[in-house]
Amino acid sequence: MRRGTIVSMLLVGLVLLGSEKAVHAESDGLSPAERAAVDHLLTTTRSVRKRLDLTRPLDPKLIEQAIEIAVQAPTGSNAQEWHFLVVTDAAKKAAIADLYRKGADQYRTMPRPDYGSDDPRHKQQARIAASGAHLYQHLHEVPAIVFVAIDGRVEKEPPAAQAAKYGSVLPAAWSFMLALRARGVGAAWTTLALIHERELAKLLDIPDSITVAVMLPVAYYTGSDFRPAKRLPPAGRTYWNTWGSRRNLTGAASHAAVHVR
């Protein structure tokens, strides 16, 4: 599949909008073509590590375009307190990579989940470990490393304030990843370098009043065969009205819930 195919698929709904607008004039939803393009983007945008193209220069304008999209994300009280720090300097990328590796080494010593052999996560562990090892070795080679941050600190805040703070920056970071993907650019969602956040802040002159939420190594990706990941069935973790209650499907029109333990 050619690289342009993905972008074409994502844009096909907009191209067809003019011809289908009359048909869907009374609906608040997207047309089938638009919905298919959006669903494809949402279900196939992956954290890219092994397939980041380390040799191809990255146009800064693509990052800026993706940020323009990202800041349309929800923000509590319309505060818009997010910040995007783009690092392309080779020496700084090398220093960031050192902090990332130090954080990764610490992470490896932490207790790991023990998934059962029939759990899809068990089968995915080796592949994810290999992907992480590749980024561990090559992080300093990516064209750009982007940090998404927000004003304020959360360490001493109550749960509601912490939720509000992260809820006002993480949607923008995810939108940034989606916008990059639509432009043929990949990113890896990682927080391991933040184990040493204060050292990172000193390296990049980040004020003490700022919280860094995520680090995103960014590069063009190779190939175009991204597909949905194997996930646990969401029905097992979807509740209605009360935690642990699932929707009763015995009646065609029933929305009652049954409690499941």
Predicted regions located by residue number:
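Small-aliphatic-rich amphipathic alpha-helix that forms the alpha element of a beta-alpha
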Residues: 65-71, 144-148, 152-203
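Bacterial N-terminal signal peptides that target proteins for export
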Residues: 1-8
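Short acidic N-proximal helix/loop "leader" segments that mark the beginning
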Residues: 23-57, 61-65
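Bacterial N-terminal signal peptides
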Residues: 8-16
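C-terminal helix-cap and adjacent tail motif
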Residues: 25-30, 44, 50, 211-261
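Glycine/small-residue-rich phosphate/adenosyl-binding loop
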Residues: 86-167
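Cleavable N-terminal signal peptides
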Residues: 12, 22-23
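A glycine-rich helix N-cap at a beta->alpha junction
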Residues: 105-116, 204-228
